[in-house]
């Protein structure tokens, strides 16, 4: 018992019968696997009971008949009377004890009507295994293979430890049909049937001196097919008893529970074959075999000396070999879905997948994470799925080499050698192969894909000895342990889920594809019940659903419509973007118009924003002149940071530098510039001192303030903005903006109004009440601090007592600001308590969490030029890295704006907003390859959703915003002599016709010759008049040129320059001037080269189909 428990057991499904399998070790056993439900078993038991009851009744009936016969002998005198009584009694007994009456009596209680199961119904089907037959003639077996021939479904080949290969069957009288005997006794390691030529059997043996280890046998299968007709007729009772030994395998099936009552009838003569038809692999052990289904003459051999060899049995001298592993090749198998893909294993932990078309390197290396692999096998029903089990392991691992998993690139684990030569492996061959291995190892350094994580792992209760895939069921596998436990394993693969572009969901299970509902309403609770919660626990809609809804609503490149859709878009950042796009072009245009009307003075004591108050101290600073050296360094640092940032964001774009240069060149024309580009331009700043704070003013700063919403003037006073913020409930921001403009009285009024307006709060819960109290307390505290502010606190002319009081007030404000939660209130007190120095204010605004537009406007007002550029630069880089749409305030729709949108797409996947926004400037002002890719992706997305109208609007708007470029001509008419074009814009000034010019000013003239070489043009084949060419006249030259002071000819739109060629060939007026009526166009056949005027040719072919040229049979109109 102990020996059998440690001996390796083999298991294999039948390729012919889906419910049969064999288990081999010391004997060979045939099993039947099926599903059986509880009702069926119960009915069979009842039927068996009724049959047994019928048999008992029949025996009783026979005993009664014998007693009646004895009574007839004793009562001979009354035979007639007794016979009559006997007949009556037999008739009564027959009516009572007949099988029909017994069956009907006991079977009428069983109801086989179909009943609907209840809601809590659980299926009662059970998996059962039946032992069908035992063949004890096969002993000491090491390998086995089921014959693939359909004509004999029970023929099995077994390899023994003695080296013999025997053919056995469960349906023949002689259990051992044939024996294949090698010359030398040695262990049989592998056996494999040819899948096409089923009479050929390959056997792999251990090595022996002077003999081959790979033998190809011809079993003469045609003579053995008659053995199927000799059935074993005397073992029916035995088989019927074995069929009753059924065990439920919800727990693993144990072989030791089966009785060892086996039989052997090998008394008949057995055919023996001693001569194989082919022999390979000398002086090497053959450990693995596999035939190629697509080429039945080729055999894969895994040897004990690290080699994987491919033989053609038709030519023993031709072979191809590769050093597959560092140790012996213990297993090889061919993928049933791709015959060029094979897998090999060794004594180490690696499985290698090869392509037979290129055996230089393996395709994939699978790291099984075990010391040694015992068995591998491809799944016959799922492509690319490979199963493996380690030695002395209780787990089976599945590897899906086609699954979308992450492959890790790793260097080669070993040298791979490829050789082509004879089948032997002598010393010369080994030396050559070693040389080839060294050279290949030096030249080949490419990494190989490695898989180390299995897609699924099945853990068994015992160490697995062998496993076998089911031939048709993709989820079923059989395993057998060393102790004889058979387990039916269900390996359900992971369910893949896929979203459709229309929002539906689809998933698959096995061969079935299930699609969820795509229509219907989603049931949601009342949103009002959760309005007071910060997070109501519901996920937001997928970004694809949002993009589709916005496209249907009319979200496009139309700025006005997008602003009207603000409520439907319901995104603060997106709404900010489109409002900025709406107002920035108007503000920049107004700024340029005002700048062109006002001449720039050398020194000015006024600012573009208005006159300075008499009490203010004013000083004029000309930026980029007095501080030229410092500003140069700042600009150089900015350019270096820009280049580094662009290179990081555009690693795959080879034209980044060109794009950036084009972007810089078009900044002046781009109406969507950001604050960053505005501030780095040359500017004249004036300094004003007010309430102890230094205020910087300049035209560029005023433009930035206007873009940020701080451009207050007579038409838009500060009071209007503060009133609007108060109505919207933004009291903290309103008070802060009033403080930043040093209007302390108005800030105190805002705080006073806030304490009255936030008191009647509608929130009735406890949390809302506490928030209201905290807000009210913070505002009252701010009003107290504002009341103590003295505008002269920062002046240097104050006495010591005032300075001491102001210092105490400042320290108190700084400590109070730390307790504020609202960033605006905190920044207010820190600003008032500062020393009015640019560096001090820089540190305050840098750490502030107020809105970006207010932060930039505040810095433009109180920071000097160097601190301002540095601050804007740092914030520009920050918003680009975060992909914050509000950062377009700094970057604008420029090259850096594309970088910002790229990070925005990576963060939110909202490619729709990026495409629509950037389409306003690309390719109108500059080009970027990323924008082209985004547009293509968004267009494909609209096509998938079948939003054809929205796609058409996108194409139209994109084309309108782009540069008008006429399509390149596809057909050129040129002279047959000089090969120059007849195009109107290509004609030089020397070809202008002047001798036949009329007094009436014309811009074009017809000439019957080439304007370049003066050769005659061909004639029309119908009217026989020469074809004409359009050339410009002298009047055209005079009307399209302007004489400069130097006497040179300066060409205007559509004119002729000094070099003699016409300028601006894209001008529409020029094309209309140079065009010729369609009836005079050149028209010719591409086959016979005959032609003429277009109108003449059209008129001819209305009634004819053959060329008008005599002796030409070309059917020009039918081409």
Curated annotation (Swiss-Prot):
PROSITE patterns: WD_REPEATS_1, WD_REPEATS_2, WD_REPEATS_REGION. Zn(2+) 2 binds at residues 1023, 1093, 1096. It comes from the Eukaryota. Zn(2+) 4 binds at residues 1088, 1090, 1107, 1112. GO terms for molecular function: zinc ion binding. The keyword Metal-binding applies. A zinc finger (C4-type) spans 973-1016. Residues 41-60, 413-455, 601-669 are annotated as: Disordered. Residues 45-60, 427-444 have a biased composition (Low complexity). It is found in: Lysosome membrane. Zn(2+) 1 binds at residues 975, 978, 1010, 1013. CDD domains: mRING-H2-C3H3C2_Mio. Pfam families: MIOS_a-sol (PF21719), MIOS_WD40 (PF21720), zinc_ribbon_16 (PF17034). Zn(2+) 3 binds at residues 1085, 1088, 1116. WD repeats lie at residues 3-43, 127-169, 183-227, 281-321, 324-364, 368-409, 459-499. InterPro entries: MIOS/Sea4 (IPR037593), MIOS_a-sol (IPR049092), WD40/YVTN_repeat-like_dom_sf (IPR015943), WD40_repeat_CS (IPR019775), WD40_repeat_dom_sf (IPR036322), WD40_rpt (IPR001680), Zn_ribbon_mio (IPR031488). Its main location: membrane. Keywords: Lysosome, Membrane, Metal-binding, Repeat, WD repeat, Zinc, Zinc-finger. One of its GO terms (cellular component) is cytoplasm. Signal peptide: none annotated. As a component of the GATOR complex may function in the amino acid-sensing branch of the TORC1 signaling pathway. Probably part of the GATOR complex. Belongs to the WD repeat mio family. This is GATOR2 complex protein MIOS.
């Amino acid at each position: 018992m102990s020996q059998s428990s440690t001996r390796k057991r083999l298991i294999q499904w039948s390729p012919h019968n889906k419910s049969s399998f064999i288990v081999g070790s010391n004997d060979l056993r045939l099993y039947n696997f099926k599903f059986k439900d509880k009702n069926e078993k119960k009915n069979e038991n009842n039927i068996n009971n009724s049959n047994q009851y019928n048999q008992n009744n029949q025996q009783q009936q026979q005993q009664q008949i014998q007693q009646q016969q004895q009574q007839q002998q004793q009562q001979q005198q009354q035979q007639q009377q007794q016979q009559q009584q006997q007949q009556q009694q037999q008739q009564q007994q027959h009516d009572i004890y007949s099988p029909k009456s017994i069956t009907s009596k006991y079977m009428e209680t069983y109801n086989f009507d179909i009943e609907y199961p209840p809601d809590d119904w659980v299926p009662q089907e059970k998996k059962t295994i039946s032992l069908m037959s035992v063949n004890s003639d096969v002993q000491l077996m090491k390998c086995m293979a089921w014959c693939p021939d359909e004509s004999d479904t029970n023929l099995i080949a077994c390899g023994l430890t003695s080296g013999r290969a025997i053919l056995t069957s469960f349906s023949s009288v002689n259990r051992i049909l044939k024996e294949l005997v090698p010359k030398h006794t040695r262990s049989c390691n592998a056996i494999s049937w040819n899948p096409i030529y089923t009479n050929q059997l390959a056997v792999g043996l251990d090595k022996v001196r002077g003999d081959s280890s790979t033998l190809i046998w011809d079993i003469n299968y045609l003579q053995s097919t008659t053995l199927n007709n000799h059935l074993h007729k005397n073992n029916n009772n035995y088989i019927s008893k074995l069929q009753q030994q059924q065990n439920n395998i919800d727990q693993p099936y144990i072989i030791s529970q089966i009785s060892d009552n086996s039989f052997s009838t090998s008394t008949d003569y057995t055919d023996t074959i001693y001569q194989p038809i082919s022999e390979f692999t000398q002086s090497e052990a053959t450990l693995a075999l596999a035939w190629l289904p697509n080429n039945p003459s080729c055999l894969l051999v895994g040897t004990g000396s690290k080699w994987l060899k491919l033989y053609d049995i038709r030519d023993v001298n031709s072979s191809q070999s590769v050093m597959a592993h560092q140790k012996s090749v213990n297993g090889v198998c061919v993928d049933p879905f791709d015959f060029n893909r094979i897998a090999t294993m060794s004594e180490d932990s690696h499985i290698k997948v090869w392509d037979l078309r290129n055996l230089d390197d393996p395709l994939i290396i699978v790291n099984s994470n075990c010391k040694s692999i015992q068995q591998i096998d491809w799944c016959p029903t799922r492509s690319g799925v490979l199963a493996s089990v380690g030695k002395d392991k209780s787990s089976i691992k599945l590897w899906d080499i086609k699954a979308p998993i992450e492959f890790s690139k790793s260097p080669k684990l070993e040298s791979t050698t490829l050789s082509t030569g004879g089948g032997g492996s002598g010393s010369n061959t080994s030396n050559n192969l070693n040389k080839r291995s060294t050279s290949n190892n030096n030249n080949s350094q490419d990494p190989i894909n490695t898989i180390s994580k299995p897609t699924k792992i099945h853990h068994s209760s015992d160490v697995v000895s062998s496993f076998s895939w089911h031939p048709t069921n993709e989820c079923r596998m059989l395993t057998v342990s060393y102790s004889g436990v058979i387990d039916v394993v269900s390996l359900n693969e992971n369910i893949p889920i896929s979203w459709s572009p229309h929002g539906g969901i689809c998933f698959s299970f096995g061969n079935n594809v299930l699609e969820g509902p795509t229509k219907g309403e989603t049931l949601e609770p009342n949103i009002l019940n959760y309005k007071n919660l910060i997070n109501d626990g519901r996920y937001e809609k997928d970004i694809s659903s949002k993009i589709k809804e916005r496209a249907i609503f009319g979200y496009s490149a139309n700025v006005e419509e997008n602003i009207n859709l603000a409520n439907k878009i319901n995104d603060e950042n997106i709404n900010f973007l489109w409002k900025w796009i709406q107002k920035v072009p108007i503000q920049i245009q107004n700024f340029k118009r005002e700048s062109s009307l006002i001449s720039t003075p050398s020194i000015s004591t006024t600012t573009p924003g208005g006159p300075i108050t008499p009490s203010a101290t004013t000083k004029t600073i000309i930026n980029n002149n007095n501080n030229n050296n410092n500003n140069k360094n700042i600009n150089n640092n900015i350019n270096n940071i820009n280049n580094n940032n662009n290179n990081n964001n555009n690693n795959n774009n080879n034209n980044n530098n060109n794009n950036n240069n084009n972007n810089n060149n078009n900044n002046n024309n781009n109406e969507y510039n950001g604050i960053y580009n505005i501030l780095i331009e040359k500017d004249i700043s004036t300094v004003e001192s007010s309430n102890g704070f230094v205020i910087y003013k300049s035209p560029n700063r005023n433009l930035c303030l206007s873009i940020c919403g701080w451009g207050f003037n007579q038409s838009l006073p500060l009071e209007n903005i503060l009133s609007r913020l108060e109505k919207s409930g933004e009291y903290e921001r309103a008070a802060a903006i009033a403080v930043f403009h040093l209007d302390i009285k108005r800030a105190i009024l805002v705080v006073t109004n806030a304490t009255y307006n936030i008191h009647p709060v509608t929130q009735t819960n406890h949390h809302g009440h506490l928030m209201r109290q905290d807000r009210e307390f913070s505002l009252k505290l701010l009003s107290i601090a504002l009341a103590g502010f003295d505008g002269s606190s920062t002046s240097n002319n104050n006495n010591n007592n005032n300075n001491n009081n102001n210092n105490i007030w400042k320290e108190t404000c700084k400590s109070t600001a730390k307790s504020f939660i609202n960033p605006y209130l905190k920044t207010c007190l820190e600003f008032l308590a500062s020393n009015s120095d640019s560096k001090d204010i820089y540190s305050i605004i840098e750490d502030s969490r107020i809105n970006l537009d207010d932060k930039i406007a505040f810095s433009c007002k109180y920071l000097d030029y160097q601190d301002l550029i540095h601050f804007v630069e740092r914030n520009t880089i920050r918003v680009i890295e975060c992909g914050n749409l509000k950062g377009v305030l700094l970057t604008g729709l420029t090259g850096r704006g594309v970088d910002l949108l790229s990070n925005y797409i990576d963060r939110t996947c909202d490619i729709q907003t990026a495409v629509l926004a950037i389409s306003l400037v690309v390719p109108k002002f500059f080009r970027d390859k990323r924008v082209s890719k985004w547009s293509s992706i968004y267009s494909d997305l609209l096509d998938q959703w079948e939003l054809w109208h929205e796609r058409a609007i996108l194409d139209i708007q994109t084309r309108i915003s782009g540069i008008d470029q006429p399509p390149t001509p596809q057909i050129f008419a040129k002279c047959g002599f000089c090969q120059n074009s007849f195009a109107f814009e290509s004609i030089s000034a020397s070809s202008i016709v002047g001798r036949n010019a009329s007094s009436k000013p014309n811009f074009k003239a017809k000439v019957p010759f080439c304007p370049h070489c003066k050769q005659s043009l061909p004639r029309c084949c119908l009217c026989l008049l020469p074809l004409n060419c359009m050339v410009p006249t002298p009047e055209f030259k005079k009307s399209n040129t302007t004489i400069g002071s130097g006497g040179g000819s300066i060409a205007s739109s559509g004119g002729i320059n000094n070099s003699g060629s016409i300028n601006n060939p894209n001008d529409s007026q020029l094309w209309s001037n140079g065009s010729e009526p369609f009836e005079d166009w050149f028209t010719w056949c591409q086959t016979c080269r005959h032609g003429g005027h277009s109108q003449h040719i059209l008129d001819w072919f209305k009634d004819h189909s053959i060329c008008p040229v005599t002796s030409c049979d070309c059917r020009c109109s039918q081409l």
